[in-house]
Design a protein with these regions (language model features):
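Terminal-region recognition feature
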Residues: 1-191
């Protein structure tokens, strides 16, 4: 890493992110995100940094929706800066930023995987009603897959990664080093 050029000088806006997130993606991170977003400058680009080993993908999607709405309603530029580890729900959040607005610090790793589910199905009752329980669980699984695939499509939009490739690699936790992410177009640059 020491022999790499200092690309940070090309992106001075990334020096002090307006929103700095770290830890598990959960309700507390979402609350911190909303509070920091409220305190961010009202003009110019908004820079969001994150370091996370993952967490709740729905909280990541909620934060991402806030970023998307900010862009859509104000036209403001939003920049993503991943630091050290952007795993799981962190990559879900990263997908809410256009590929050309994403950056990673040197040595950072991304990790993308399929959504996980742990569930038990209790079948109890008249036989004619049991199929409804199974169908309800199947509907939940199928909708979760659709949500996952929408996020995967957002993550690879405008990159050199094909959606089918991402889906194939995500089955076994795809770890991507910062420089590889840049070369694949998943991020604009590494600083």
């Amino acid at each position: 890493m020491a022999d790499q050029p200092n690309n940070a000088v090309n992106y001075p806006a990334l020096a002090v992110p307006h929103i700095q997130l770290h830890g598990v993606v959960d309700d507390r991170m979402y609350d911190s995100f909303k509070q920091q977003l409220t305190g961010a400058p009202v003009e110019g680009p908004i820079v969001v940094s994150i370091t996370t080993l993952g967490g709740d993908p729905e909280m990541a999607r909620a934060m991402g929706d806030s970023i998307r709405l900010l862009r859509d309603y104000t036209g403001r530029e939003t920049l993503f800066l991943g630091k050290v580890a952007v795993y799981s729900a962190g990559a879900t959040f990263m997908a809410s930023f256009p590929a050309g607005s994403r950056f990673l610090t040197r040595g950072t790793r991304l990790m993308v995987h399929e959504r996980l589910m742990q569930s038990n199905i209790q079948l109890n009752g008249p036989l004619n009603t049991l199929s409804y329980t199974l169908k309800a669980k199947l509907n939940e699984i199928e909708d979760s897959i659709r949500i996952q695939d929408e996020g995967f499509a957002d993550l690879v939009a405008g990159t050199r990664v094909m959606l089918d490739e991402l889906k194939r690699k995500a089955t076994s936790n795809w770890y991507i080093e910062a420089e590889d992410a840049r070369d694949l177009g998943l991020v604009l640059d590494v600083i």
